[in-house]
């Protein structure tokens, strides 16, 4: 009986590891949106807008700037690496003055950034304070909106 217990002590963990490896087999090649057992929460992440974002990414040059809310920067970097994000949540990469200006931004700040970084695409959280600047400017239009965010494009003349 002691011998059976000793074997079970080694066999059971090996079986558990084997089952886990089989469950994960091939999933490292899938993006988080393609995996069946791992899903992004559509209430928090703009997964329903992703097809439009990827289509725009393909039609514009690599490194095209996109204006985005801070919390969506990492999402964009991961899913659409061809865009150059305006900001992301790695705050240590940005100067304190810039972060304060971003948080307290006025229309004049937004206009200055728009001139400095000529973005024609924007992805904003559904409750973003920046939405008022896009809604008030007739040059910007909504491409798509989901529960988490709004995708805008600027009419270029």
Where are the predicted features?
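Short periplasmic/luminal acceptor-recognition loop of GT-C membrane glycosyltransferases, typified by
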Residues: 58-96, 120-125, 152
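Short, basic/hydrophobic alpha-helical segments
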Residues: 47-61, 108-117
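Soluble non-cytosolic domains of exported or imported proteins
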Residues: 44-47, 67, 108, 125
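Membrane-proximal, lumen/periplasm-facing interface regions of secretory-pathway glyco-
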Residues: 2-58, 71-73, 80, 91, ...
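Periplasmic/luminal catalytic loop of GT-C fold multi-pass membrane glycosyltransferases
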Residues: 99-151
